[in-house]
A protein has these predicted regions:
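Glycine-rich phosphate/diphosphate-binding loop of Rossmann-like nucleotide-binding domains
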Residues: 1-33
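Short, glycine-/small-residue-rich phosphate/pyrophosphate-handling segment
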Residues: 83-108
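Short coil/turn connectors at secondary-structure junctions
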Residues: 20-23, 47-51, 71-75, 88, ...
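N-terminal beta-loop-helix "entrance" segment that forms/cooperates
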Residues: 24-48
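Hydrophobic/aromatic ligand-binding patch that stacks against planar heteroaromatic rings
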Residues: 16, 66-69, 94
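Short glycine/serine/threonine-rich phosphate/pyrophosphate-binding segments
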Residues: 6-11, 34-38, 57-66, 85-88
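Glycine-rich phosphate-binding loop
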Residues: 41-80
Length: 108
């Protein structure tokens, strides 16, 4: 997720993964504020056994697209409500990926 303010929503995904017995990593890295850290973390994900990323982000929601650009396996983008537009900005950001950067979008 891109910010600790996203933890309230994204922790629900963690609960579901735990109930299903699926191991996971939960990390907070901003695509806008920490791009180098995001690149390093994402490029090493597959070697750590990660098979799918669930990337939650609000507002401009660059995180899911950046993850998809750097990670060869599936990325699920979760648009989160920001300060404006009730999360619709994040929905459109995640749904409008360029060709070759696939992101599945899951919204509540």
């Amino acid at each position: 997720m891109g910010s600790d303010s996203d933890l309230k929503v994204m922790s629900k995904a963690a609960v579901m993964l735990e109930e299903l017995g699926i191991e996971y990593e939960m990390t907070i890295i901003s695509a806008h504020r920490e791009p180098d850290e995001l690149i390093e973390w994402t490029r090493g994900a597959e070697s750590r056994g990660i098979k799918v990323m669930i990337a939650g982000a609000g507002m401009a929601a660059a995180l899911p697209g950046m993850c998809a650009a750097l990670f060869a396996l599936p990325v699920i983008g979760v648009p989160l409500s920001g300060k404006n537009l009730d999360g619709m900005d994040a929905v459109f950001s995640i749904m409008q990926m360029p060709p070759g950067v696939p992101v599945a979008t899951v919204a509540n």
